[in-house]
Design a protein with these regions (language model features):
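Non-catalytic substrate-recognition/targeting regions of SAM-dependent transferases
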Residues: 88-180, 440-456, 463, 478-546, ...
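Conserved AdoMet
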Residues: 44-107, 460
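A short acidic, Gly/Pro-enriched loop at the edge of an enzyme's catalytic core
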Residues: 311-319, 626-636
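C-terminal catalytic and target-recognition region of SAM-dependent MTase-like enzymes
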Residues: 307-402, 673-729
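Conserved S-adenosyl-L-methionine
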Residues: 186-312, 335, 552-611, 618-621
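Conserved helix-to-beta-strand junction in the class I
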Residues: 227, 295, 346-350, 664-671, ...
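Polybasic, low-complexity RNA-engagement segments
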Residues: 23, 64-72, 380-387, 392-481
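S-adenosyl-L-methionine
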Residues: 2, 8-38, 42-43, 47-67, ...
Length: 729
C-alpha cells in the first residue's frame, strides 16, 4: 500500500512591524519586543523594527510600556515623485485593510526625500485609497484627521516609501486613566521609563517604599504601580487601530486580553510595597487622586498635600523618583536652583541609603547635587532634552556654622580702645548666639566716639558699614579710623580680607583697604535658627536679612502656627519664611519691587516651600488691600521711613499714609488676629486715632536683642489687635 505524500504547508512569511518611541527609549522597546515574541529586531533612532506573527504586534499594543505606536508594514517601494507614490499606493488591495465606512487618515514623515512636503505626500496616498474604493464600489471612504478609525502611516526615507497600518490607533501613551491634567505633565511612556530605569521591577520588596515627593498628577506613581502589579498598560484603553482593520483577529485579541486580566489579578493579590506621593499644590493632589482612581489603584497608592520641607523617611529602604520643575524662564530657573539645593540637603538628611531616580532638563541644576550618580540616561520630554540620574543617596553631615575664634589684639597703639570694645562685645555675645542658634548678629554699633561704624557678622563674613563724618568733621580722619577698625577686626576674629565687605550708610561705596571689589555681586546662604536665607553683602540697599528685625521675625515664627500670614511691603520674604517654617497655613507676600519678590521666592524654595498657597504679589500694598477679600490671622506691615528733605509737611503726610495703610490692613485682620507694625523711622509714633480704635502696644523694648542693646532704636515696632465687640443691648 502506497502512503500518499501530503504536501508540506508553506510557512506564512513573518510580518514586519515597527514600534516608534521617544528618543532614548529604543533599547527598552527592543527588550519588550523580544519579551513579546518578536524576532530580528533592529534599532533605529526613535523606532525599532522586528519580524513576527500578528500576536507579537497585538502583545506590543497591549503590553508595551515604552512604545508610542505599533505599525504593521504593508509594502515598500521606490517613489522618486508624487505620481509614482500615487500609482504604487493604488496597486495595494485596500479592501484587505479598510472598510469603506471606516473613517481613515494618512500621516506621513519625510526624511531627505525628493517629495519634500509631508502633507502633500499624505494627500496623494489618501487620493489613491479613495479613488480605488470609488472605482470599485462607487463610494469614497470618509477622511477624519482628528479621530480616524484607521491610521495609515507613510514614511519617506530618500526615494524609498514604506506604507503601514497603525495598529495602535491613538498613541500608546494614552493609557486611559488620565482624567485630570496638571501643568507640564509627563507622558505615560516616559514616566514608565523613568521608574523602570530607576530600578523598579516586579520583584521590588514589599517592605520598601516607592516615593514621589513632587508627584503632580501622579503619573510616575501610577506607572510604578502598573509595573509592580503586572498590569498591561493597554488594558484600560477603549480602542486600538486594529479594531477597525479588516484582518483583525478577534479571537486572538480576546485570548490576550483574558491572559492580561488574569496576570493583573494575580499581581494585585501579591504583597505590595507602599507607594506614596506628595505635592505642595492642592490642585495637583486632587488631579493625582482622580487619575489614580481612574486607574483602579486608589487602594495601592496614597497621595497627600505636603511641602517638600516636610519630607521624611517613611521606611528604612526605598526608591525615590522625582521630576522637579524645570523653570522655562531664566528668572524661574534662578529661583528653582534653590529648590534643588534644599532637595539635595533634605535627601541627605532623611533618605540616606535609598535609591533615587532624578529626572531633570537642566544639567546645571542636577550637577549641583552632592550625590554621586551611578547611571545617567539621555531622555526627551517632548522637545526638551533631559537626563535621568540614578544612584544611591549618601548621608550628608551638616556642620553648624561655627563662630569665629577670638584672638588677642596687639596691646597699646592706635585703635586699642576699639579693639578692646570689640573683643568685649564678642565675649558677651558669642555664648548668647550659640545658645539661641543665631549665626548672624551685630558685633559693634558705633559704641565709641570716633568709631562711627557698624560691624555685622553673617556667619563667615563681616559687613562693615561706615557712617558719614559728622558735620564739620574731617572725612579723611573718619576713613582712617574706619581702616584702623578693620585692622582690629582682622586681628581679633582672624577674618581674611576676602570675607570682609564694606559699605557706606545711605548708599555709595566705602573706601577701605579690606574687602573684595564692591561691584561684584555676592550671594551667600546663612542660617537663622531653623531658617535659611540668601544675603547680598554687596548691595548698598540692604543685605536682604536686616539684623535689627531678627527679634520681630522670631516673634512672627512663634505666632504663625495654624494662622494665615500676610506680609505687606514684605521685601525678600524673610519674615514669611519664619512663618512657613513654624506652621503657617498659607502666606501672602506683597511688595512693589519684582527683584525683592524674586529673592523672596528663592528664600521660600531654599527652605522647601512653594505652591499656590504661598503667594507673592507685585503691587503697592495699599492698592492691593483695596481689592483684598481674604482674612489673615497674622499680619506684618513694613512701613517705610520718611524721606530726608526740606519738606516740613512730609512727616505728617507720612503718618497719614501709614494710618491709611494700617486701617486697610486691620480690615483684613481676623477678630482674634495680631498685626505687627515695623517702621524704619526712630521718631515714628502712631496717630492717636489708631490707639482709640484698636488695642495698640509699643513692643520695641521687648524686641531689643542683646546685640542691639544700648543702641538707638532705629526700627520701632507696635502690635495692633481689634477691640472686643461691645455686647448687644
Amino acid at each position: 500500500m502506497i502512503t500518499p505524500v501530503r504536501p508540506k504547508r508553506k510557512k506564512k512569511p513573518p510580518l514586519s512591524f515597527v514600534a516608534t518611541c521617544g528618543a532614548g527609549l529604543e533599547q527598552l522597546v527592543a527588550g519588550e519586543i523580544e519579551a513579546q515574541g518578536g524576532r530580528n529586531s533592529a534599532v533605529n533612532p526613535g523606532a525599532v523594527s522586528w519580524e513576527g506573527n500578528l500576536e507579537s504586534g497585538y502583545r506590543m499594543c497591549l503590553w508595551s510600556r515604552f512604545a508610542s505606536r505599533v505599525l504593521l508594514q504593508i509594502t515598500g517601494f521606490d517613489a522618486p515623485d508624487a505620481d509614482t507614490l500615487y500609482r504604487q499606493a493604488g496597486k495595494i488591495d485596500w479592501d484587505e485593510h479598510l472598510a469603506c465606512d471606516t473613517p481613515f487618515a494618512v500621516f506621513s514623515t519625510v526624511t531627505d526625500s525628493p517629495i519634500s512636503h509631508s502633507k502633500y505626500a499624505a494627500l496623494r496616498i489618501k487620493d489613491a485609497i479613495a479613488d480605488q474604493f470609488r472605482s470599485r464600489s462607487g463610494r469614497r471612504p470618509s477622511v477624519d484627521t482628528s479621530r480616524p478609525g484607521m491610521r495609515i502611516s507613510l514614511h519617506l526615507q530618500g526615494s524609498r516609501a514604506t506604507l503601514a497600518v497603525d495598529l495602535s490607533g491613538d498613541s500608546l501613551h494614552r493609557r486611559g486613566y488620565r482624567r485630570a491634567a496638571v501643568e507640564a505633565p509627563l507622558k505615560e511612556t516616559l514616566a514608565a521609563a523613568i521608574v523602570y530605569l530607576s530600578g523598579l521591577r516586579r520583584s521590588f520588596p514589599p517592605d520598601r517604599v516607592v516615593l514621589d515627593p513632587m508627584c503632580g498628577g501622579g503619573t510616575l506613581l501610577i506607572e510604578a504601580a502598573m509595573i509592580l502589579g503586572d498590569s498591561a498598560p493597554g488594558l484600560q484603553r477603549k480602542s486600538f487601530g486594529f479594531l477597525f482593520w479588516n484582518r483583525h483577529d478577534e479571537r486572538l485579541w480576546e485570548k490576550l486580553v483574558n491572559e492580561a486580566v488574569r496576570r493583573e489579578e494575580d499581581g494585585h493579590r501579591q504583597p505590595w510595597p507602599r507607594i506614596i506621593g506628595y505635592d505642595a499644590d492642592p490642585h495637583a493632589v486632587t488631579a493625582a487622586r482622580e487619575n489614580i482612581a481612574a486607574a483602579g489603584l486608589d487602594d495601592k497608592i496614597t497621595v497627600g498635600q505636603r511641602q517638600l520641607a516636610a519630607l521624611e523617611r517613611p521606611a528604612d529602604e526605598g526608591l525615590l523618583v522625582v521630576n522637579p520643575p524645570y523653570g522655562e524662564r531664566l528668572a524661574d530657573r534662578e529661583e528653582i536652583k534653590y529648590l534643588y539645593r534644599f532637595l539635595d540637603r533634605q535627601l541627605g538628611r532623611e533618605l540616606a541609603g535609598w535609591r533615587i531616580g532624578f529626572f531633570s532638563s537642566n544639567p546645571d541644576l542636577a550637577g549641583g547635587f552632592s550625590l554621586n550618580w551611578s547611571d545617567s540616561y539621555k531622555l526627551f520630554n517632548g522637545p526638551i532634552r533631559c537626563r535621568l540620574h540614578c544612584g544611591t543617596i549618601a548621608r550628608t553631615t551638616e556642620h553648624a556654622p561655627g563662630l569665629p575664634s577670638l584672638h588677642e589684639p596687639e596691646t597699646g597703639g592706635e585703635g586699642a580702645d576699639f579693639a578692646a570694645r570689640l573683643q568685649a562685645n564678642c565675649r558677651r555675645l558669642f555664648p548668647w548666639a550659640e545658645r539661641e542658634d543665631i549665626s548672624c548678629f551685630r558685633l559693634y554699633g558705633s559704641d565709641l566716639p570716633g568709631y562711627d561704624l557698624a560691624l555685622d557678622l553673617y556667619e563667615r563674613w563681616i559687613l562693615a558699614t561706615g557712617h558719614a563724618a559728622a558735620a564739620g568733621g574731617d572725612p579723611r580722619a573718619a576713613d582712617h579710623r574706619f581702616n584702623v577698625a578693620l585692622r582690629a577686626v582682622r586681628e581679633i576674629l582672624a577674618i581674611p580680607p576676602g570675607r570682609i565687605f564694606l559699605r557706606k550708610a545711605g548708599g555709595g561705596k566705602k573706601k577701605g583697604k579690606a574687602g573684595p571689589k564692591p561691584s561684584r555681586t555676592k550671594i551667600f546662604e546663612v542660617d537663622e535658627q531653623r531658617c535659611r536665607f540668601l544675603v547680598n553683602l554687596t548691595d548698598d540697599r540692604g543685605t536682604g536679612l536686616p539684623l535689627a528685625r531678627r527679634s520681630l521675625r522670631l516673634l512672627i515664627g512663634r505666632s504663625a502656627e495654624g494662622r494665615t500670614f500676610l506680609n505687606l511691603n514684605g521685601g525678600t520674604g524673610t519674615a514669611t519664611v519664619h512663618a512657613l517654617v513654624n506652621g503657617a497655613l498659607a502666606t501672602t507676600t506683597v511688595d512693589p519691587a519684582a527683584g525683592q519678590l524674586h529673592l523672596a521666592r528663592s528664600n521660600f524654595f531654599l527652605n522647601g516651600f512653594g505652591g499656590p498657597q504661598h503667594r507673592t504679589i507685585q503691587e503697592d500694598s495699599l492698592k492691593w488691600l483695596a481689592g483684598c477679600r481674604s482674612r489673615f490671622g497674622l499680619i506684618l506691615v513694613n512701613a517705610p521711613c520718611c524721606p530726608d528733605g526740606r519738606d516740613s509737611a512730609a512727616p505728617s503726610r507720612f503718618r497719614l499714609e501709614h494710618e491709611q495703610l494700617l486701617r486697610a490692613a486691620m480690615k483684613v485682620l481676623t477678630r482674634e488676629g495680631l498685626l505687627l507694625l515695623a517702621v524704619d523711622d526712630p521718631c515714628f509714633t502712631p496717630a492717636p486715632s489708631l490707639a482709640a480704635d484698636f488695642i495698640l502696644e509699643d513692643i520695641s523694648s521687648r524686641l531689643t536683642a542683646p546685640d542691639f542693646a544700648g543702641q538707638p532704636n532705629r526700627s520701632p515696632c507696635f502690635a495692633f489687635r481689634h477691640r472686643p465687640l461691645e455686647p448687644e443691648g
